[in-house]
């Protein structure tokens, strides 16, 4: 099956999961079957899917953006999804508040814009690096991140082409950890 046909099938499958509010697991590394993300599909187009992420411990965990082309398999309504749904229910978890998505806006751009407007930490992954920090500048082609160190301090400006970003997270527990460290308080997390 060609890559384009496969991506079209994936979009159709994910659209059904979104319409029926099915908790899905998206596998993104064919070499590592344990490399997947789980959650409810918040937004979907032919380029990206945004999940309202659910952690393996049954807690809502921000949002994660994945390129549709990188999804090697999607599974919904399996035992793992049922387990996560039960944990969400028993814990009384409430969904993460949505972020704004403007009409026709690129999803990655929207995620970066929301992080910038709220002064929040975002994580961007390229093929070679992971960038954790606050958005300093954003345009249609690039994002400049104040990349934080291990202690959430000493931001170093790094500019990344949006087309090079393979995944992004916003509002996840890891992002919040850096927000707490950089602010010295947990007021947002």
Q: What residue ranges belong to the model's regions?
A:
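Short glycine-rich, low-complexity segments
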Residues: 1-36, 54-129, 149-189
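Viral structural modules
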Residues: 1-2, 136-139
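N-terminal "domain-start" segment
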Residues: 34, 44-49
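Short beta-strand-centered aromatic/proline hotspots
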Residues: 35-42, 131-137
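Residue-level recognition of beta-strand microenvironments
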Residues: 44, 74, 138-140, 168
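Short aromatic-glycine-enriched beta-strand elements
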Residues: 47-52, 142-146
